[in-house]
């Protein structure tokens, strides 16, 4: 990839509306709006929210509702789901929700779709999802697309009102090869979760590009890659701030998802060598550092992945540090 091509790589924001230890969900929502407005000023292209359930430290479970809230408080940044876990929902309801959002905020809504539960099995059952729901994802996706663009006579069909005839860009999200291949075969844009599945990143992207078939949506493959970046004014501060993110994943490894914890001086006082290895393996794509470190590592990441767009996740305990992180990332990318 040439420098000119990399210059054109867009930056976007992934937000899980983190709830910090001692904080409130209301504060999380206010911070999410603040970040969206500033991200728009800093030149980020999209702002996506992710569906997760029964996780005390993640407040974006009612994803479509939050998308409407964020879109209503911003002016031009694209807002969408990164993603909606389609097997948790009726395709009809998702078509109606996103048809409504696109009608309210025309030309600004994205519908990113995944097939994972976004939660544990007990919560999945509470969502009325059965254990094999993900296997039906291609059929459910086709059903959803037909609600937006029905084929044939619609007189005797169930219709999505609003939704029918509305152009909502659909993305497929994934952390393995299944969605990569499906996105390629359908000619849809693909977003890969390198921020928690780094080992599968390059193989999945190659599979997507190799299986790509031009469609009425895309003439060429378009790949967005998610990555966690913790940026600060110095390498030392960034490393300190990143310990909140490490603790987040350590809690997941231990099966005890929690609110986002404050940074610590020494992670080795908290995790075992085995846990450290597990977290570091899962977060091996994470970029942590000051401006120059972030710039160099992000350029290498784009060169390796050939990404058309980068979706940045940046979680720190203090909201001001998170805002500064996103500001630094935007600044070094714009001025490289």
Swiss-Prot record:
SUPFAM superfamilies tied to this protein: Bacterial luciferase-like
InterPro entries assigned to the protein according to its UniProt record, in alphabetical order: Bact_Lucif_Oxidored (IPR050766), CmoO-like (IPR019949), Luciferase-like_dom (IPR011251), Luciferase-like_sf (IPR036661)
Give Gene Ontology CC terms: cytosol
> Which GO molecular-function terms appear in the entry?
oxidoreductase activity, acting on paired donors, with incorporation or reduction of molecular oxygen
Q: Which Gene3D superfamilies match?
A: Luciferase-like domain
The similarity comment for this entry is: To bacterial alkanal monooxygenase alpha and beta chains.
Instruction: Check the record and name the NCBIfam families matching this protein.
Output: oxido_grp_1
> What's the protein here called?
Uncharacterized protein YvbT
Q: Which organism is it from?
A: Bacillus subtilis (strain 168)
| Lineage, highest ranks first | Bacteria, Bacillati, Bacillota, Bacilli, Bacillales
């Amino acid at each position: 990839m040439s420098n000119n091509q990399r210059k054109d790589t867009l930056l976007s924001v992934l937000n899980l509306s983190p709830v910090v230890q001692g904080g409130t969900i209301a504060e999380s929502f206010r911070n999410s709006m603040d970040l969206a407005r500033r991200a728009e000023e800093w030149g980020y292209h999209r702002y996506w929210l992710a569906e997760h359930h029964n996780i005390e430290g993640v407040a974006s479970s009612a994803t479509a509702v939050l998308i409407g809230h964020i879109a209503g408080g911003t002016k031009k940044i694209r807002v969408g789901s990164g993603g909606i876990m389609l097997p948790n929902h009726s395709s009809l309801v998702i078509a109606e929700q996103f048809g409504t959002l696109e009608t309210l905020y025309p030309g600004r809504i994205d519908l990113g779709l995944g097939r994972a539960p976004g939660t544990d099995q007990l919560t999945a059952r509470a969502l009325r999802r059965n254990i094999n729901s993900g296997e039906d994802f291609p059929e459910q996706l086709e059903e959803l697309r037909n609600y937006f663009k029905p084929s044939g006579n619609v007189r005797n069909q169930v219709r999505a009102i609003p939704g029918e005839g509305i152009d909502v860009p659909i993305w497929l999200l994934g952390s393995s090869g299944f969605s990569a291949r499906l996105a390629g075969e359908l000619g849809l844009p693909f977003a890969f979760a390198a921020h928690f599945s780094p080992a599968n990143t390059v193989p999945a992207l190659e599979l997507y590009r190799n299986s790509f078939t031009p469609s009425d949506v895309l003439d060429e493959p378009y790949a967005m890659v998610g990555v966690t970046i913790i940026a600060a004014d110095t390498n030392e501060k960034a490393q300190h701030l990143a310990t909140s993110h490490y603790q987040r994943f350590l809690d997941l490894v231990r099966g005890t998802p929690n609110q986002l914890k404050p940074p610590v001086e020494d992670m080795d006082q908290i995790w075992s060598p085995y846990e450290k290895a597990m977290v570091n393996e899962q977060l091996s794509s994470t970029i942590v550092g000051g401006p120059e470190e972030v710039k160099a590592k992000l350029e290498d990441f784009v060169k390796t992945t050939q990404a058309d767009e980068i979706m940045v996740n940046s979680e720190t305990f203090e909201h001001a540090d998170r805002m500064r992180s996103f500001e630094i990332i935007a600044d070094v990318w714009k001025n490289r």
